[in-house]
């Protein structure tokens, strides 16, 4: 069993006085962060959190969430990170599925069957001596993060200490490390992209400027004045920043804008080239512990639309019907590497289907060019990506079909200037219902960003001979709107 020293403890020992986290005007060193985490450990131990248990975390970006995530690793518990944008029903389902023993949150949340502890309540309560892991076993689970399959049923992706370590090492070999590096973190830490920055923070000994809530004005100013060298963004954020930049440019110390969440439009990249902003396009998912492919800024315009090549310790190929296909042939993107999950929690069926001989079948469609650069054509074909958030049509359709006046439902994405895409519903009625009623019904059951922006009524939905819904025909209807 391969082990490593407890990451934050080791970092606090090696560089105790180096700044770890900056939030607004607060600065915390690695030693101070370690001390805060030990305190949280002692409070969590008092409420009964033990090694091997799963604890749900529903918190916004901030020092509190950082200390809870690290404290759970200190006691050897598994952090089940919940998306704060989900509805109560969705959150309860995930907590039940993950078999959590309790929820730690900074929000008002009522759950009948699961003990709920507010962070303030935990920290104001008694302490108890904690049994702290001085070593991490790389095979052990560290986090569970839920992702939805095209079926719409979320699956808990198990990421081990080894997965997170490999992800951080792969990123450092790709982007390099500098003593003056500062990564601006504006992605939610319940997403693997945000969480991966916490890992890099303690492994690299790198300063992180944490933005509690997405604020384009603050981020724009921080890039100009706070010594930021790297930032992770999605296209929507990049567009917001360019609007604020106007005719100016960012300091040359900004060496990398890591762009994820789907391919970027060419005009956006051309503007970045004009302004000397180095954009690195990436491809990754929860199952790969963040990025697995990156296109360096050198190729921004010669390989427009490409997600680049795999990280050093990763492999990637394109398969069709189980056979590896040559360059420029479309097929399924299949990946392998030490950062790739070993499977889904309590879902042996999905694990067997997705991971074969160590290769993860992503369900995404793409091709490689003659030099091995990846081009992603469709992210899980039916997926809607709205403001960097994944929306699975099947989940919305399930909600629509639970309405008594809805006989059939189909959902596709519609292009939106602000969010990239937004969901649109097509409905066959079985009784009297209005568009407004349908949207209101969805608002009660879905996260706000998943609620259809339009509901259109049809006599029947387009289907093939085997009665499978033809989403491409619904997309054509959207284009004609």
Swiss-Prot record:
Q: Which reaction does it catalyse?
A: 2-succinylbenzoate + ATP + CoA = 2-succinylbenzoyl-CoA + AMP + diphosphate
Family affiliation? Belongs to the ATP-dependent AMP-binding enzyme family. MenE subfamily.
One Pfam family cited in the UniProt record for this chain: AMP-binding_C
- InterPro entries, per the entry: AMP-bd_C, AMP-bd_C_sf, AMP-binding_CS, AMP-dep_synth/lig_dom, ANL_N_sf, MenE
Function in brief: Converts 2-succinylbenzoate (OSB) to 2-succinylbenzoyl-CoA (OSB-CoA).
> Per UniProt, what is one GO molecular function of this protein?
ATP binding
Q: In which pathway does it act?
A: Quinol/quinone metabolism; 1,4-dihydroxy-2-naphthoate biosynthesis; 1,4-dihydroxy-2-naphthoate from chorismate: step 5/7; Quinol/quinone metabolism; menaquinone biosynthesis
- Which BP terms in the Gene Ontology apply to this protein? menaquinone biosynthetic process
Supply the alphabetized keyword list: ATP-binding, Ligase, Menaquinone biosynthesis, Nucleotide-binding
Report the protein name in the record. Answer: 2-succinylbenzoate--CoA ligase
Known EC number: 6.2.1.26
Q: Which domain of life is it from?
A: Bacteria
| Name of the encoding gene | menE
């Amino acid at each position: 069993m391969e082990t490593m020293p407890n990451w934050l403890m080791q970092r606090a020992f090696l560089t105790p006085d180096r700044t770890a986290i900056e939030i607004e005007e607060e600065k915390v060193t690695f030693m101070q962060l370690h001390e805060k985490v030990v305190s949280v450990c002692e409070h969590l131990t008092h409420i009964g959190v033990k090694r091997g248990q799963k604890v749900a975390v529903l918190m916004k970006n901030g020092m509190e969430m950082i200390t809870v995530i690290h404290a759970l690793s200190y006691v050897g518990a598994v952090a089940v990170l919940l998306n704060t944008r989900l509805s109560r029903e969705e959150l309860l389902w995930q907590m039940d599925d993950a078999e959590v023993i309790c929820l730690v949150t900074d929000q008002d949340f009522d759950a009948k069957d699961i003990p709920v502890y507010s962070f303030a309540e935990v920290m104001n309560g008694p302490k108890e001596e904690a049994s702290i892991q001085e070593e991490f076993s790389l095979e052990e689970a560290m986090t569970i993060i839920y992702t939805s399959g095209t079926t719409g049923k979320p699956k808990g992706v198990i990421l081990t200490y080894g997965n997170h370590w490999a992800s951080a090492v792969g990123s450092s070999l790709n982007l390099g490390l500098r003593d003056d590096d500062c990564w601006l973190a504006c992605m939610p830490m319940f997403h693997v992209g945000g969480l991966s920055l916490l890992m890099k923070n303690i492994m690299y000994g790198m300063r992180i400027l944490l933005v509690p809530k997405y604020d384009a004005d603050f981020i724009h100013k921080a890039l100009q004045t706070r010594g930021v060298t790297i930032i992770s963004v999605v296209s929507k954020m990049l567009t917001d920043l360019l609007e604020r930049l106007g005719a100016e440019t960012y300091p040359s110390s900004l060496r990398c804008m890591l762009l994820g969440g789907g391919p970027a439009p060419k005009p956006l990249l051309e503007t970045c080239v004009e302004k000397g902003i180095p954009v690195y396009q990436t491809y990754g998912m929860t199952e790969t512990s963040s990025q697995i492919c990156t296109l360096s800024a050198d190729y921004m315009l010669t390989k427009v639309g490409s997600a680049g090549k795999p990280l050093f310790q990763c492999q990637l190929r394109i398969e069709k019907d189980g056979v590896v296909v040559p360059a420029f042939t479309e097929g399924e993107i299949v990946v392998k590497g030490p950062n790739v999950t070993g499977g889904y929690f309590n879902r042996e069926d999905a694990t067997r289907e997705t991971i074969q001989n160590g290769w993860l079948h992503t369900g995404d469609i793409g091709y490689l060019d003659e030099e091995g650069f990846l081009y992603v054509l469709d992210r899980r074909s039916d997926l809607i990506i709205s403001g960097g958030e994944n929306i699975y049509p099947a989940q919305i359709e399930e909600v629509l079909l639970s309405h008594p006046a809805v006989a059939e439902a189909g959902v596709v994405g519609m292009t939106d200037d602000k969010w990239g895409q937004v969901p649109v519903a097509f409905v066959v009625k079985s009784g009297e219902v209005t568009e407004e009623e349908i949207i209101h019904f969805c608002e009660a059951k879905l996260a706000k960003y998943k609620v259809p922006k339009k509901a259109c009524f049809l006599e029947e939905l387009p289907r093939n001979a085997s009665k499978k819904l033809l989403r491409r025909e619904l997309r054509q209807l959207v284009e004609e709107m």
